[in-house]
Amino acid sequence: MSLPSCVPGYRRILLKLSGEVLMGEQQFGIDTDYVARVAQEVKDARDSGLEICLVIGGGNIFRGMAGAAKGMDRAQADYMGMLATVMNALAMQSALEQLGVPTRVQSAIEMDKVCEPVIRRRAERHLEKGRIVIFAAGVGAPYFTTDSGAALRAAEMKCDALLKGTSVDGVYNADPKKDPAAKRYETVDYDTVLADNLKVMDASAVALCRDNNIPIVVFSIRERGNLARVLAGEGTQTTVKKEA
C-alpha cells in the first residue's frame, strides 16, 4: 500500500515492533516471509520521506522475565533477552537490504563483528542519509524492557512519535481477549494510562514519552497495509498523548 508523498506531522518516527510479531503464525522463532512483508511496509514508509528508527523486542526467541520466573537469575535472563533482540534486528536488516533499503543496526551491547555500537550522532547521520537505523539490546542494562529502550531512543533521536506495532489494534480499558465488553480508546492521556495501569508499555516507558511529549500510537502491524494507514491518520489505532 503506497503512502502519500508527505505524511502530515511526522518527519522522524520510531517504530517499535513486538518480537512476537516476527513469528508470523509460528509458535517460536522468526518467520522470514512475515519479516519480509513487514520490511516492505517499512520501506514504503521510508520511501514517503520519513526518517525511521526501529526497535524490535525479543519475545519470539527469549523473554527475560519468563526466564527469571523459572528460576534463572533475572539479570542473566535479561541479557539473554537483549541478545534475542539483536538476532531480530539482524533479520530485519537482512530483509530491508534485500529490498534495497540501506540499514544499520546499533546495539547497546557492543559486538563489533555484527553491528555498530549505539552512537547518537552517527545514528542521526544515518537517518539524514536515508538509512533506517535499528536499535538493539534495549538500554544495555537488565531490569529494563525493550519498551523502555524504544522510549529512550525516541527521545534521544528527537522522534515526532513512537509507533508501537503489536498484535492488538489499540489500547483497551480491559483485556479484549477476556472481556467482550472491553472498549478501545481513540485517544488517551499519559496520566490515565499510568493511573489505570493500561497495557500500553511499562510505566517507565510511558513516563519518558510523557516527559518528552512524544505521542505513542498503538496499532496492529499484523494487518497488511496498516502501517501506511496509521501514518496517513487512518485505520484503527489508539494515540497516547498529553491531555487536551
Curated annotation (Swiss-Prot):
The keyword Transferase applies. GO terms for cellular component: cytoplasm. Keywords: ATP-binding, Cytoplasm, Kinase, Nucleotide-binding, Pyrimidine biosynthesis, Transferase. One of its GO terms (molecular function) is ATP binding. It catalyses: UMP + ATP = UDP + ADP. Homohexamer. Belongs to the UMP kinase family. This is Uridylate kinase. The gene is pyrH.
